[in-house]
Amino acid sequence: YNMLLNLDKHNPESIAVKDSNGLQITYGDIINLAVLVEHNITPRSLVFVLTENNAGGVAWVMAVILSGNVPLILDAHTETSLLENLIDIYKPQYICRPQTADSETYGYNLNATWNPHYQLNNELSHLLPTSGSTGSPKLVRHKYDNIEAAALNISTLFRLTSADRPF
């Protein structure tokens, strides 16, 4: 799988993300989760990742991308009718959502939808909704290069170095 942002070059024991609930996830944990995802779902699948504002959500988004699959990143509390509309339009092969306190999956479950698999562009890294409030089913498509460029822009703007800690 693609080692986006050189995650494999970080100390696997170093904390990659932590949240206000005290959950800490290491770089090694994210890579292990990506391997778990990669070995358990069809390659280049569309995965709706319904996230809460927590470390588990960050880990799942990263793991789905690192495993070579494409997440549509949505708020876990997206209105039911909007979510159903998005599922009808985009027909994801999997849906990941917060459901369990399982420490191996950081409080999220991944379930197959049984929608047929279809070809996704090889450059597509992830999808984001254009707006959470209008109910529009339109999505913004992002490429792998966009992630690297955004990370570089952010690190340049804030003059971040590898010695800086995000928390």
Model-found features: residue ranges?
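A short N-terminal helical cap/helix-turn-helix that marks the beginning
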Residues: Y1-I15, S125
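Conserved pre-ATP/AMP-binding loop-to-beta segment of ANL
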Residues: P12, A112-P129, S136, R159-P166
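Conserved AMP-binding/adenylate-forming
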Residues: L23, L36-H77
